[in-house]
Amino acid sequence: MTSKSLTHLVFGVLFGCLFLQTAMAQISIGGKPYSFALRTHTMSPPPVLMPGINIGKLEAEDLLDEQAGLAPRFGDLIEVSLNTNNSGVWETLPDGGRLWRLSIMAAGAKSINLLYDDFYLPDGGVLYIYSADRKHVIGGFTSANNKADRIFATGLVYSDHIVLEYYEPAEVIAKRAANNVAEEASISINYVVHGYRFIEFNPNDLVKAFGSSGSCNVNTICSQGDNWRDQIKSVVMLLSGGSRFCTGYLVNNTAQDCRPLLLTANHCLGTADAISSPSVNTWTFMWRYESPNCTPNTDGPTNMTTSGGTVLANPGSPGSIFSSDFALIELAENPKTAGYDVYFAGFDATTTAPSSATGIHHPSGDVKKISMENAALTGTSYGNTSGTATHWRVADWDSGTTEPGSSGSPIFSDATKRAMGFLSGGGAACGNDLPDWYGSLGYSWTNGGASDSRRRLNAHLDPGGLATFVDGSANPCNVTPPA
């Protein structure tokens, strides 16, 4: 039995078609790089060339990853040491400001995204990243993106040649000098991700791209989603470790305090772990990636993203699909306070099986889909029809299916509209009647009696010991918790 983490590979769908306009990634201020406004076009510095990649080797590794139940991969991590001190070019501007630019080329890449081991911007400084032809821009990133551990990640730029541009106004430099404070920017890149899966849809290519999920999948905008409009807004596509993707969902808690908690699958974590390695500040989360049409399938918006988080709880054995395969993450950037139209899904830790259920997910990195099971779920161990009820078994989908990339997505009780689990894996696909298994939120509540709060969900989803369930809310900040 394999997890929903590979088979019909491709990340292409993740960020859709390339538009000839500025786009933003993570929480950012938008706008355009400083150099774009200069009267005379200034040449970018010569690019730092990345080594070539071995596609055959990567595809062989991808097959092994599938067997191991890892999340699907779209890019190859290239280790580097590029920063504002050892790379790029600084120049002083006529107004006294400063500009730093670094050019990176990964020949043949479908996209490039970056991971940072030290990222800090002073107030007033702004960073943009753009394709060398200036057709795709992300940013601007500011001090609002600084993290306590100074780890950061930026989203995909659809080109094999990108430019980083950091602008520091004269007043920022003057303030630093006047206060005698060494508040210098630090932009240190430790990984360049060479995207080797197609991103733009080309019907003549055999490699799948946008619209790559099976034809039986149903867009959430279709009538099947009419009773689930709120819950649909809770589901998010995530980039784990900068080079793989899964699905997750924003979840409410009994304190109803707008805390940005996200549930996904443990096997999506890679080496991250609540105890030994809790930071996932290299992760990126894409909200509201949904088709505006039922049919034909149309790409959705890709500009609502946040980055970073901390693993609060998982069952241990990083990357394992067994136990109940849960992972709870606290997001570093709250999509609600960023102004995104999101929903905090309700949950239910009951061990009583729902009589019917609905799943919402991003199959093969595609726009959001909805799947329906009209029969009762059963509590079983993973991959079985009986055993310790660590999982909910979906016998076969009556509408839609799940695929690689759907891992970590929620399954909701039709009766209560509360989430009851997160997808681990299974054999379901268009054209078959094979089962799927979702990690049970009820089992994960105590995780078989785990003593450490980092190995169970109840300490975080019910911090006051109030209840084992809560309804969803678009704005739980203003809701009075149950007595």
Predicted segments, located by residue:
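Extracellular and analogous surface-interaction loops
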Residues: 91-95, 100-110, 119, 154-156, ...
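Short, surface-exposed beta-strand/strand-loop-strand elements in extracellular ectodomains
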Residues: 120-136
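A short aromatic-anchored loop/beta-hairpin motif
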Residues: 27-96, 100-105, 197, 201, ...
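Sec/Tat signal peptide C-region and signal peptidase I cleavage site
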Residues: 19-25
